[in-house]
Amino acid sequence: MESYKSEFIDFMVESDVLKFGDFTLKSGRKSPFFMNAGAYVTGSQLKRLGEYYAKAIHANYGDDFDVLFGPAYKGIPLAVVTAIAYHELYGKEVRYCSDRKEAKDHGADKGGFLGSKLKDGDRVVMIEDVTTSGKSMEETVPKVRGAADVTIVGLMVSLNRMEVGQGGKVSALDEIHEKYGFEGKAIVTMEEVTEYLYNREHDGRVVIDDTIKAAIDEYYKQYGCK
């Protein structure tokens, strides 16, 4: 496992972003784990988060893109901090763009987007916290492609939950690839998280013990990718 991956897993636990217990997801599924990117609230946390996203994007997509697009609302700060980190780490200037839940009807920046305008020929990397079932892309992709003649290079999420999408046959990220034609990648997968944290102590406690591991295994029997 690359060092930035293990560091990111530790970072999620330290930031109380990755939790284990009983949760109901947006998709309606009952899950033994939950990731809440909204728990990144301090300047130092956001700085580190942007760096991990930037490293993962660079490792998977290289430098051949122009815009980081973060869907509202959680994707907005993700796109901003990653654009900053990408410039600091790799010296490349990339723009950020996000959609508005409600279009602005006045001012120089009126319309359905904030940040940089999308232009014909732009190569776009989408950025989200986590994709469970792919529902979020149903609104976002048409908006981005309808704004200009752009190429969506790919989608980067922080955690690949490695479970089936809405169709119930392939993973949410594979489903997005089949439906929209671009690949989805993640900083880490849930398999990597489980393997790394199983029986490992954080602040004097084991994060994933035998009971939690059994619950995760049972969850993937029902929702895991085949």
Swiss-Prot record:
Catalyzed chemical reaction(s): orotidine 5'-phosphate + diphosphate = orotate + 5-phospho-alpha-D-ribose 1-diphosphate
Keyword field contains Glycosyltransferase: yes
Keywords associated with the record: Glycosyltransferase, Magnesium, Pyrimidine biosynthesis, Transferase
Cofactor(s) the protein requires to work: Mg(2+)
An annotated GO BP: 'de novo' UMP biosynthetic process
Amino-acid positions noted as binding 5-phospho-alpha-D-ribose 1-diphosphate in the UniProt annotation, renumbered to this chain: 26, 73-74, 100-101, 104, 106, 128-136
Pathway(s) of this molecule: Pyrimidine metabolism; UMP biosynthesis via de novo pathway; UMP from orotate: step 1/2
Binding site for orotate: 132, 161
Gene Ontology annotations for the cellular component aspect, listed alphabetically: cytoplasm
Enzyme Commission number(s): 2.4.2.10
Domain of life: Bacteria
Claim: Endoplasmic reticulum is one of the keywords in the record: no
GO molecular function list: magnesium ion binding; orotate phosphoribosyltransferase activity
Known function: Catalyzes the transfer of a ribosyl phosphate group from 5-phosphoribose 1-diphosphate to orotate, leading to the formation of orotidine monophosphate (OMP).
Family indicated by similarity: Belongs to the purine/pyrimidine phosphoribosyltransferase family. PyrE subfamily.
Subunit structure: Homodimer.
Xref: NCBIfam families: pyrE
UniProt protein name: Orotate phosphoribosyltransferase
Protein's gene: pyrE
